UniProtKB/Swiss-Prot annotation:
GO terms for molecular function: cysteine desulfurase activity; iron-sulfur cluster binding; metal ion binding; protein homodimerization activity; pyridoxal phosphate binding; sulfur carrier activity. Belongs to the class-V pyridoxal-phosphate-dependent aminotransferase family. NifS/IscS subfamily. The modification Cysteine persulfide is found at C381. Keywords: Cytoplasm, Cytoskeleton, Disease variant, Iron, Iron-sulfur, Metal-binding, Mitochondrion, Molybdenum cofactor biosynthesis, Nucleus, Primary mitochondrial disease, Pyridoxal phosphate, Transferase, Transit peptide. Active only in complex with LYRM4. Optimum temperature is 46 degrees Celsius. It comes from Homo sapiens (Human). Optimum pH is 8. The active site is at C381 (cysteine persulfide intermediate). InterPro entries: Aminotrans_V_dom, Aminotrans_V_PyrdxlP_BS, Cys_deSase_IscS, Cysteine_dSase, PyrdxlP-dep_Trfase, PyrdxlP-dep_Trfase_major, PyrdxlP-dep_Trfase_small. N-gluconoylated. This is Cysteine desulfurase. The keyword Cytoplasm applies.
């Protein structure tokens, strides 16, 4: 009691200490291009430097990289950041019981979204860890009998790197090519399965081009051949309907910050019946049924659960709205600009992820010109590289077009005005950059660029 009283006095003292009055919280504030960032949103050193000037907040159109935290999710998390701070694994007092109850409620919310049993949900730090557990965990557990895995050339980097790591351990991995649409050939998948294949890993929605793989068909093939099926559903959960039983999915990776939840938390679904055995990657206290040791962060899993519940309630509405905005963006850009290519299959496609290539324009130059809009040229995990996207190369995109691609992300909080502004600025800067391009000038003069023999100096 004395310690608690002292803590309260210290908190009051800090609150009452003289100094500048703190700025009002900015939660829920939508900033648009041209707005000045609130003083509380400016770093202290920037705010103190008069030569820096006003700070502009660009429009956010990069929801494949991450999504903003839904205010309803934050409301659910706050009590577990402030009052209910017990360790959910401490089962001898009320603090632990409160946190454990919240953790299990979140587990139920995640399971409900994908049609799973709550006991099949294991909390992790995010989709990268979930993918590592699924791929390495299954491969290593069954290594005595099965040493072959199958994945695709367009998977997320953490899946590809996990497979390469297993190859260094002596496993054999088949990397299936994709068609120009970005979708795998199911006949090639069937032909690739061997008697010693333990796992097939195919992502649900591609993070760069938004293509949806035929997950239910893949699940049926794997089930009939008695091979476990894992899907990285980070870009799909909460955005399109998924049912792990109907689709015969054995393992699924989920990310919190891709569905308007907090960063640093995710989950992996691991089927119980028939049971999928996984070798744990880390040692410790045996939390999460021994599959993922470490104290579960209650506020984060509460946020993940709340995000899943909101997504389940609003999925149909969000999808219709995002589809309309996506159609608006694509049509308005393509009717105003020639030589624009949409990458990936337009029919089997999640509408919130649009990847366009603007011929005769360098993607990095266009990104720099569109400084008022937060966009990406591809995956946030590989966008620091100047190499063309391996996903675009895999679908047969010419290197020049691959270098000219921009990914537009439309999400729950994207407005029609933001889409129109992005379209307007995109058209303006593509036209300006093309006017500066000698290649564009040659094309306008009717010269076939492929007929030119370039020489090095």
């Amino acid at each position: 009691m004395l310690l608690r009283a002292a803590w309260r006095r210290a908190a009051v003292a800090v609150t009452a200490a003289p100094g500048p009055k703190p700025a009002a919280p900015t939660r829920g504030l939508r900033l648009r291009v041209g707005d000045r960032a609130p003083q509380s949103a400016v770093p202290a050193d920037t705010a103190a430097a008069p030569e820096v000037g006003p700070v502009l907040r660009p429009l956010y159109m990069d929801v494949q990289a991450t999504t903003p935290l839904d205010p309803r999710v934050l409301d659910a998390m706050l009590p577990y950041l402030i009052n209910y701070y017990g360790n959910p694994h401490s089962r001898t007092h009320a603090y632990g019981w409160e946190s454990e109850a919240a953790m299990e409620r979140a587990r139920q919310q995640v399971a409900s979204l994908i049609g799973a049993d709550p006991r099949e949900i294991i909390f992790t730090s995010g989709a990268t860890e979930s993918n590592n557990i699924a791929i390495k965990g299954v491969a290593r557990f069954y290594r005595s009998r099965k040493k072959h895995l199958i994945t695709t050339q367009t998977e997320h980097k953490c899946v590809l790197d996990s497979c390469r790591s297993l190859e260094a351990e002596g496993f054999q991995v088949t990397y299936l090519p994709v068609q120009k649409s970005g979708i795998i050939d199911l006949k090639e998948l069937e032909a690739a399965i061997q008697p010693d294949t333990s796992l097939v890993s195919v992502m649900t929605v591609n993070n760069e081009i938004g293509v949806k793989q035929p997950i239910a068909e893949i699940g049926r093939i794997c089930s009939s051949r008695k091979v476990y099926f894992h899907t990285d559903a980070a870009q799909a959960v909460g955005k399109i309907p998924l049912d792990v039983n109907d689709m015969k999915i054995d393992l699924m990776s989920i990310s919190g910050h891709k569905i308007y939840g907090p960063k640093g938390v995710g989950a992996i679904y691991i089927r119980r019946r028939p049971r999928v055995r996984v070798e744990a990657l880390q040692s410790g206290g045996g939390q999460e049924r021994g599959m993922r040791s470490g104290t579960v962060p209650t506020p984060l899993v509460v946020g993940l659960g709340a995000a899943c519940e909101v997504a389940q309630q609003e999925m149909e509405y969000d999808h219709k709205r995002i589809s309309k905005l996506s159609e608006r963006l694509i049509q308005n850009i393509m009717k105003s600009l020639p030589d624009v290519v949409m990458n990936g299959d337009p029919k089997h496609h999640y509408p919130g992820c649009i990847n366009l290539s603007f011929a005769y324009v360098e993607g990095e130059s266009l990104l720099m010109a569109l400084k008022d809009v937060a966009l990406s040229s591809g995956s946030a995990c590989t966008s620091a590289s100047l190499e063309p996207s391996y996903v675009l190369r895999a679908i047969g995109t010419d290197e020049d077009l691959a270098h000219s691609s921009i990914r537009f992300g439309i999400g729950r909080f994207t407005t029609e005005e933001e889409v129109d502004y992005t379209v307007e600025k995109c058209i303006q800067h593509v036209k300006r950059l093309r006017e500066m391009s000698p290649l564009w000038e040659m094309v306008q003069d009717g010269i076939d660029l492929k007929s030119i023999k370039w020489t090095q100096h």
